[in-house]
Amino acid sequence: HVFARESITAAKLNELFSAYSNVHIGLVPDIVMSANAILLGTTDCVAPLGILRCLRDDKEAALSAEQYSMIDKALAATGHTIEKTDTHAGGSQLNEAQCTKLLTDKLSQFRAAKLVVTDRLHGMILSLLSGTPCLVLPNSNHKIRQTQLDWLRNHPRLVFLELDEIADIATFIDSLLSVPHGRMDESPVDIAEYDDLKKALVAI
């Protein structure tokens, strides 16, 4: 069994393993979306304040300098405090306690925001786990867009904005700022989406 977390990769795997009848290709959401913030040890915070900006600055970024400027101008115009963050923690050879603290601290940071603006896959997922409304932008690969299309198309606290829509980003920011936070004991996707994975694991 080989499981992909979005349909483009699943199609590539089906093509790659087409000659091997003993290889089953499955499709399930990113495994992190099977959890929720409470299960991951995060507690609720005071009333959410400010906007969290979690945008790539590496080779996987798809935004131009002009688009970054548009985004920052629109965020500043809200009058809210803007905090910049990333989902890459750095470091290596971390023990379990250190990893747990990094994750719970990051979830708490996302929960404490009124809105998250991100082009990172796990920035989007952390937003959904924390119940915080999220404005999602594309990056240079298909993963974040296809994850949204496959599993999160109708999520009430998520808006995916294409690059040619960034000129209108202020409208989407204002709309999402009025969306209330979700509960922290809810998973972003229906747990039944993982049934095929569960069956495969039981059969091992």
Briefly describe each language-model feature range.
Residues 1-204:
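Active-site anion-handling motifs in enzyme catalytic cores
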